[in-house]
Amino acid sequence: MLETNKKQIHIVSFSGGKDSTAMLLKMIENNMQIDDIIFLDTTVEFPEMYEHIDKVEKYINRKITKLKAEKDFEYMLLHYEKKKGKNKGQKGYSFPDFRNRWCTNYFKKSIIRKYIKSKYRNCEVIEYHGIAVDEPDRLAKNKEKIIKYPLAEWNMIEQDCLNYCYSKGFNWDGLYEKFARLSCWCCPLQRLGGLKIIYIKNILICGIN
């Protein structure tokens, strides 16, 4: 159970995608307590995502806390020197994959842990994550009592979230017409079709034949 002798702080984990956007907007509509809204910048977001974050911030007329790790993705990928273990001295973490998503820990989990510990040390923190009801595997993996999933409680599926965001005027400049997910553009969980679109787009930009 949550401790009742500490001040409760309600934090929205805001990635900027359709699910977290729908969750944030509906929480505000429902007059739910929100003390902080946190966006964790991996430095490899789609350019349109940064525009979306600014648009949401203006729409809700509230500050979105933007947190970023000390080093960017390129540095960690290619230049970071490992300090211990069998790979001590090795440069770069290499590209993340399904088994080794070091980027999630470095750019997200460790950053928000440090932020909460620093700013809300003596508080009872409750986080809100945007996981839809049709993502049972993700919901099953996240059973922490300090994390709540309003979308699942509202019985909203992913398509409901997207439609809701569209109805509020948010369209990410058409990104969801091309990609199933809008995390980092280089995310190892990106679907093959999305990776092909990124590949073709960059070939055109670079003028490669």
Q: Over which residues does each language-model region extend?
A:
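Nucleotide-activated chemistry modules centered on ATP-dependent adenylation/adenylyltransferase
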Residues: 1-209
